[in-house]
Amino acid sequence: MLANGATRRGESGAVYSFIEPLGENARSRRNVWLIEEEGKSNVEFIAKGPSTEDDKSLGWPAFQHELKMQRLFNKDKMIRPMVDLIPSSATDEPMMVLKPFEQTLWEARNARPMTTSEIKWIMEGVLLGLQTVHQKGLVYTDLKMENVGITGFDNDKPNENIREIIVRIADCGSISEPGRREISSLTYRSPEVYFGKSWNQSTDIWSWGIILAQLLLAQVDFKSPGMYDAISTGKLEDKTQVARKAMATDFDLFSIPLYAEEEDSASLLPREQPGPDDIYGWAVDMSEKGISGEDLQFLVDVLNPRPDVRPTAAEIMSGGYLKVQLPPK
């Protein structure tokens, strides 16, 4: 097992010193490390190896898939780049050497309320990252604030120049072709996934819309949990059922044939249909807290429970909502 102070050589010839393991389970897992390139003062990177669940006997397929995706997108500016690969040895597993970022979007969201310009700038960066993935016919599948890297965000006060905020999509391990299996974290999961439908690039747009809704809500009610973030107790299946029921009510899935008229999904709908005052209650709540009509209309368009009419990344980019006044370069 790797220990603090260990050194390993990458394919580039660079030698890296392992400083400390990172992550919530750093002591037991030790597959993600902060490392430093020897001979270069304060040149730090992130080293990421196979997880403990990855099958070594099969050559770490999950790691190999993520490595393949990193190489596929390595020249795309909106994806966190891989700078080197540390090959496996008789005693150690392979590790990707990744460019670091200062914090995740989740950490930035919890630092302070963001300005409207900051929110739109960051969300445009995330959308550009998704568009990069979508243009290759692939789906990111696990978009959440924790998978967005942020550098240059001032945690104490609004950035005077939002160009200083650099946004990158991180963690390419979940990128895949369109499918039907269960994907995404509960908070960011789209209705089509919750109800067992096939999904494509539009599921990423739903997740993107949930992030936007959470950032806008934090602007006016900083301590409030975001949409579907309050579902945090109980077993996974119990939480899934609670979220599915809430979504069926919030977006009136009973009235949409895709969910109500097909047996596999209709059986997952709650027994009691919501009353007219319950439908789109989330939008009413956000309006009462001060979210503008323009923002709410945009969210209603993006968070359309019908994936076939949800806007694409390109359509959102050209629609003008994300446009902000930028300072001169």
Locate the predicted segments by residue.
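Conserved catalytic-loop aspartate of Hanks-type protein kinases
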Residues: D204
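Activation segment signature within eukaryotic-like protein kinase domains
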Residues: I122-M123
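Short beta-strand micro-motifs within the conserved protein kinase catalytic domain, predominantly
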Residues: P81-P94
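ATP-binding glycine-rich loop module of kinase domains
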Residues: V15-L72
